[in-house]
Amino acid sequence: MEKVTKNVYAETKVRGCNPAYVVTSSGVVIIDTPQLPTHAVRMRKEAESHGEIKYLINTEYHVDHIFGNYYFRGAGIVVAHADTANNFMTVTPEINPYEYAHEAIPTDDPEGEKIWPDEKTYFEDPNRPTIIFKGDLTIRLGDHSFELIHTPGHTPGQLAVYIPEERVAVVGDTIFNGVQTWLYASDVDQWIESLDRLKKLDVDKIVPGHGPVCTKHELDVQKAFLLEWIAAVQSAIGRGLSKEDCVRHIKDSEFSKRFSVDIGQEYMLDHVIE
């Protein structure tokens, strides 16, 4: 995993989210877990080489941030916002997150099939959150503090984790850096407000949900992208297009092709932009 600062590590180059961990004087804090089984097992082993895992924070409920919790059972207390806990691995008519996660195995993690749980076994204990809260929460562990900031927009229970001692924020999918932004079921107005809130943090580096480690500049880039997207949708609505035609129009435009879709998500483009 990439060493972001002296005590912060993140993975930014595999299918799924950018999971991270932070080493403190009293143990390790995990922030999101890998979607791919072998990566989850490897991350746990690497993190535990620095000390006991005390907390696992999930920044949202999308499967690429939480599926790997299964491989961290017995390793720390799982923490999440109430809206994330309420939607944790929920099967909907649109998507079964368990099946979606398994689709990545043949192409991205064939060795993961050997440690893949059947669906019944998985749902018996997917390692759900047990510290559940609304608003913000601060966790202190050893010589570090972790400010869990509610940043709704991408999902209702979205969190950013600010570690002031490292001058780093792990912001989850509030930033997509250099890859197509996943807008499915998002509240873009809330998202913009959350970006403005994160601008106030005193940080040198940001770990985004997808794409390379970045700086506060990418908060402005993400905001500009969302504002431009709103304008494109408003323009399509003003021309009398239906929702379906609006999605089709934007999908076929240069605007939606500005960034590539993140690793392994090419076939999900309709969900990304809808």
Positions of the model-derived regions?
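Active-site HxH/HxHxD metal-binding segment of metal-dependent hydrolases
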Residues: 41, 45-134, 138, 231
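Residue-level detector of beta-strand structural context in well-folded domains
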Residues: 18-20, 131, 135-137, 159
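Conserved beta-strand hairpin/beta-sheet module of binuclear metal-dependent hydrolase folds
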Residues: 2-48, 160-172
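Divalent metal-coordination and catalytic microenvironments
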Residues: 7, 22, 32, 47, ...
